Amino acid sequence: MFNIRNTQPSVSMQAIAGAAAPEASPEEIVWEKIQVFFPQENYEEAQQCLAELCHPARGMLPDHISSQFARLKALTFPAWEENIQCNRDGINQFCILDAGSKEILSITLDDAGNYTVNCQGYSEAHDFIMDTEPGEECTEFAEGASGTSLRPATTVSQKAAEYDAVWSKWERDAPAGESPGRAAVVQEMRDCLNNGNPVLNVGASGLTTLPDRLPPHITTLVIPDNNLTSLPELPEGLRELEVSGNLQLTSLPSLPQGLQKLWAYNNWLASLPTLPPGLGDLAVSNNQLTSLPEMPPALRELRVSGNNLTSLPALPSGLQKLWAYNNRLTSLPEMSPGLQELDVSHNQLTRLPQSLTGLSSAARVYLDGNPLSVRTLQALRDIIGHSGIRIHFDMAGPSVPREARALHLAVADWLTSAREGEAAQADRWQAFGLEDNAAAFSLVLDRLRETENFKKDAGFKAQISSWLTQLAEDAALRAKTFAMATEATSTCEDRVTHALHQMNNVQLVHNAEKGEYDNNLQGLVSTGREMFRLATLEQIAREKAGTLALVDDVEVYLAFQNKLKESLELTSVTSEMRFFDVSGVTVSDLQAAELQVKTAENSGFSKWILQWGPLHSVLERKVPERFNALREKQISDYEDTYRKLYDEVLKSSGLVDDTDAERTIGVSAMDSAKKEFLDGLRALVDEVLGSYLTARWRLN
C-alpha cells in the first residue's frame, strides 16, 4: 500500500533551480486566479481540494489524488472545465490554466512514486512510500499517538475470521447495483487488516451503509461521496474522520475521545454529537446545522460555512481560523487575540465585538456582504488605526433576492430597435436563455443598467450592444461569460462593473486565441499591451490593498482601472464607479501607478509577450514549421541539460538514485530549456512583429 510523506530534498531545490518560496501558499496563489471558475457554493470544497492536492496528507492514495483532481474539475462551471486538465501527457500528470490559458499549477506523479507540485516557478516535493514490502506480513498494527502498538498481531490472527464473517455477510446483503462497491470496500478492509495500514479510504463506492465493524486499528477513516444515512460505531483509536458528500447523512455517532480531526462537510447534518476534548480541526460546512455544541479547548480551526446558524458558541482561546460565511449570524462571540483568520462574510451582522480590535497584526478579517453601514466601517477604521489588522468588506450590503427576467427581455433593453421588416435581434436570445447560467447573465444585464456608467456615459449602451452581438455569434465565449455572471450579481454597483471588466478581458484573450488577429498583428500587440497593463495594475492594487487596514479589494482594483482608463488606453474598462471615496486610493497613488505601468511596459513588455498564450497560438498558425521546431528543440534541450546535470551534480555529489535530487535537477533542466525556447522565440517574434514592439510611452 502506498502512502505519502513529505520529504526534505538532499539537494536544495532553491540552490539548484534558484527558486524562492512564494509569500502565499500555492493553493492561495492558484485560487486567486481561478476563483471565477466556480459557483460560490463550491468555493470551500474547491479550496479544500486544492489544499489536499498541494499538500497531500500521509495516507492519501494515488487513486484518491486523481479523484480529487477530477472532483475539482467537476466543481467548475462547464465552460471552464478544460482549464482543469487531468492525465495530461501521461497517466498521472495534471495542470490548471488561468482564464488567460496560462499554466499556473502542475502536479506530476511518476511511476517511482515522486509527487511534484509546481506553481509559478516554485516546486514542492513529496514521496509515496511503501509501508510493507510485497508479500511481507505486518507483525503489528499502526502506532497510536504515544508510539505504541494498538493491538498485537496475535490478536489480529484471532479476530481476522470474525471480522471477515461480518464483512462477507455485509457484502452478500448488498442491494441491487451496490455489489461492486461493497466488494471493493471489503477487499480494501481485508488488505487494511492484514497489512496493518492505519488508513481506510472507502472511496466513492455508491454505498448506502457500512458494515457494523470496521478494522479496529485504523487511525484515519475517509468516506467521500457516497449515499450513507448513518455511520457504524467508530474504532476507539480513530484520530481523523473525513465523511463528505453524503447528502442523506443527518447525524453522526458518538465520536472517539482521541479524535483530532473531523471533516464532515457537504452532508445533511442537522446536529453534531459532543465533540472530543482533543479535537483540533472541525470542518462541517454545507450542512443543515442551526446550532453548534460546546467547542473543545484544543480546537484550532473551525469551518461552519453554508449552514443556518444564527449564533456561535463561546470560542476556545487557542482558535486560529474561523470560517462561518454564508450563515444567518446576527452577532459574534468575543474573539481570542490569537485568531489569525476570520471569515464571516455574507451574514446579517450589524455590529461587531470590541475584541475584534485586539487581534494581532497578522490577522485577516472578512466582513463582505453584511449590512454594516459606512459609518460603522469608518468608526472601525478609526479604532484599528495602525494596528496592522486587515479587514475586508464590500459595499454590497445585505443580499436581496431578485428574480431574473427572461434573458431575451434583458437583452432587448440594450439592443437597437429592428428596422421595419427585420427580425428583432433579441429574438435569437430566447434560445440562449435555456443555456447554463443564462439567468445569472440576465441579472447582470439588469444590474448594469443601475450603475454609474449607464447613468453618466452616453456611449455605454452602445458598448454593451456590441458585446452582446459578438456573444450571440460565439457559443464558446458565451458559455465562459455566462459562467462568470454567477459571481457578478452582487447588489454592489462597483462589483458588477468590475465583473464586466473581467468579462471584457476574457473576450479580448478569446478573440486573440481563436485567430481574430492573425492578419492584424498590430491589434494582437495592442491586446497584449492592455493585458500587460491590467496585470501590472492588479499587482499595484494588491500592494496598495495590503497597506490598508480596512479594505474592499474590488474598490481598490476598480479605482486604479477607472481613474487610469484614459491615460493607459484601457479599452476594456469603463469610465465610472460609485464608491471611489471608500477605496483608499489617493491622487498620488494614481500618479505613481501610471508612471510605474508605463515604465514597466517600455522595459518589460517585449519579454512578457514571449510567454503569452495567444501569441503562441497565432505563431503556430502563421509559421507552424518554425514554431514547432522551437518546441521540439525545447524537448531536446531538456533531455541534454538533464543528462549534463545528472553527470556533473548527482554523480559528483554521490546522489545517484536520490529521487529528491533527481527531481530537483529535472526542474532546473525544465527551466533551462524554457529559457532557451524563449530566447529562440525572441528572434522569431522580432521578425514577425517588428516595430510593433518598440517602446510605447515617451517618459520625461
Curated annotation (Swiss-Prot):
<dbReference type="GO" id="GO:0030254">
    <property type="term" value="P:protein secretion by the type III secretion system"/>
</dbReference>
<comment type="similarity">
    <text>Belongs to the LRR-containing bacterial E3 ligase family.</text>
</comment>
<keyword id="KW-0832">Ubl conjugation</keyword>
<dbReference type="InterPro" id="IPR051071">
    <property type="entry name" value="LRR-bact_E3_ubiq_ligases"/>
</dbReference>
<dbReference type="GO" id="GO:0042025">
    <property type="term" value="C:host cell nucleus"/>
</dbReference>
<keyword id="KW-0433">Leucine-rich repeat</keyword>
<dbReference type="GO" id="GO:0016567">
    <property type="term" value="P:protein ubiquitination"/>
</dbReference>
<feature type="region of interest" description="Linker">
    <location>
        <begin position="396"/>
        <end position="403"/>
    </location>
</feature>
<keyword id="KW-0833">Ubl conjugation pathway</keyword>
<feature type="repeat" description="LRR 6">
    <location>
        <begin position="320"/>
        <end position="337"/>
    </location>
</feature>
<dbReference type="GO" id="GO:0030430">
    <property type="term" value="C:host cell cytoplasm"/>
</dbReference>
<dbReference type="InterPro" id="IPR001611">
    <property type="entry name" value="Leu-rich_rpt"/>
</dbReference>
<dbReference type="InterPro" id="IPR032675">
    <property type="entry name" value="LRR_dom_sf"/>
</dbReference>
<feature type="repeat" description="LRR 4">
    <location>
        <begin position="280"/>
        <end position="297"/>
    </location>
</feature>
<comment type="function">
    <text>Effector proteins function to alter host cell physiology and promote bacterial survival in host tissues. This protein is an E3 ubiquitin-protein ligase that interferes with the host's ubiquitination pathway and targets host proteins for proteasomal degradation. Can ubiquitinate ubiquitin, giving rise to polyubiquitin chains (in vitro). Polyubiquitinates host PKN1, leading to its proteasomal degradation. Down-modulates production of host pro-inflammatory cytokines by inhibiting NF-kappa-B-dependent gene expression; this depends only partially on its E3 ubiquitin-protein ligase activity.</text>
</comment>
<comment type="subunit">
    <text>Interacts (via leucine-rich repeat region) with host PKN1 (via the second REM repeat).</text>
</comment>
<keyword id="KW-0808">Transferase</keyword>
<feature type="region of interest" description="E3 ubiquitin-protein ligase catalytic domain">
    <location>
        <begin position="404"/>
        <end position="700"/>
    </location>
</feature>
<keyword id="KW-0843">Virulence</keyword>
<feature type="repeat" description="LRR 2">
    <location>
        <begin position="239"/>
        <end position="257"/>
    </location>
</feature>
<dbReference type="InterPro" id="IPR029487">
    <property type="entry name" value="NEL_dom"/>
</dbReference>
<keyword id="KW-1048">Host nucleus</keyword>
<keyword id="KW-1035">Host cytoplasm</keyword>
<feature type="domain" description="NEL">
    <location>
        <begin position="406"/>
        <end position="700"/>
    </location>
</feature>
<keyword id="KW-0964">Secreted</keyword>
<keyword id="KW-0677">Repeat</keyword>
<feature type="active site" description="Glycyl thioester intermediate">
    <location>
        <position position="492"/>
    </location>
</feature>
<feature type="repeat" description="LRR 8">
    <location>
        <begin position="361"/>
        <end position="381"/>
    </location>
</feature>
<dbReference type="Pfam" id="PF14496">
    <property type="entry name" value="NEL"/>
</dbReference>
<feature type="repeat" description="LRR 1">
    <location>
        <begin position="217"/>
        <end position="238"/>
    </location>
</feature>
<feature type="region of interest" description="Interaction with target proteins">
    <location>
        <begin position="1"/>
        <end position="395"/>
    </location>
</feature>
<dbReference type="GO" id="GO:0004842">
    <property type="term" value="F:ubiquitin-protein transferase activity"/>
</dbReference>
<dbReference type="Pfam" id="PF00560">
    <property type="entry name" value="LRR_1"/>
</dbReference>
<dbReference type="GO" id="GO:0005576">
    <property type="term" value="C:extracellular region"/>
</dbReference>
<feature type="repeat" description="LRR 7">
    <location>
        <begin position="338"/>
        <end position="360"/>
    </location>
</feature>
<protein>
    <recommendedName>
        <fullName>E3 ubiquitin-protein ligase SspH1</fullName>
        <ecNumber>2.3.2.27</ecNumber>
    </recommendedName>
</protein>
<feature type="repeat" description="LRR 3">
    <location>
        <begin position="258"/>
        <end position="279"/>
    </location>
</feature>
<feature type="repeat" description="LRR 5">
    <location>
        <begin position="298"/>
        <end position="319"/>
    </location>
</feature>
